[in-house]
């Protein structure tokens, strides 16, 4: 799905970098993330530099961000062997993630940190790409709020929304 879009956008055929971040998604209990004080599910998304998802994983909010990131990287390493760089938020800075990244040749992870001097909302470089993608997902009626009982159902609707994004972009070109 990425190759036709990248070719029509005059970009390299393979995404060379991606962004990863975890938003909160649900009101009903599937797990509890004590760090963010969120009950429900988490969605880990790895998107290319244009905002199109490469891989999305949905799981209980009780699983730490670092463990979810390790799962995402483990699942993409064979599908996208040309991937060179992942920008991630500070929740992904851990030894578990570094161990998985070390298994993938030429892949490195760069943590985008917020400055200690900044107060309030600040647009962080590279993080806004994935935030924008989650905003696009939020426009979809089925993804505006997590009404699904199964994590696989939510992942399927995210896949459908991703296909809609890609098709609309291709239609505009």
Task: List each language-model region with its residue ranges.
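Short alpha-helical elements
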Residues: 1-173
């Amino acid at each position: 799905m990425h190759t036709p879009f990248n070719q029509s956008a005059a970009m390299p055929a393979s995404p060379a970098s991606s962004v990863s971040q975890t938003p909160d998604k649900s009101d009903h209990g599937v797990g509890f993330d004590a760090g963010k004080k969120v009950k429900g599910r988490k969605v880990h998304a790895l998107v290319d530099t244009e905002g199109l998802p490469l891989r999305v994983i949905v799981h209980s909010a009780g699983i730490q961000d670092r463990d979810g990131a390790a799962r995402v990287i483990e699942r993409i390493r064979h599908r996208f062997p040309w991937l060179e760089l992942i920008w991630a938020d500070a929740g992904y800075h851990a030894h578990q993630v570094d161990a998985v990244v070390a298994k993938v040749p030429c892949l490195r992870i760069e943590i985008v940190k917020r400055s200690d001097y900044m107060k309030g909302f600040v647009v962080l470089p590279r993080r806004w790409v994935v935030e924008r993608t989650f905003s696009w997902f939020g426009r979809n009626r089925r993804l505006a709020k997590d009404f699904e009982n199964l994590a696989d159902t939510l992942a399927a609707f995210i896949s459908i929304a991703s296909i809609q994004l890609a098709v609309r972009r291709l239609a505009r070109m």
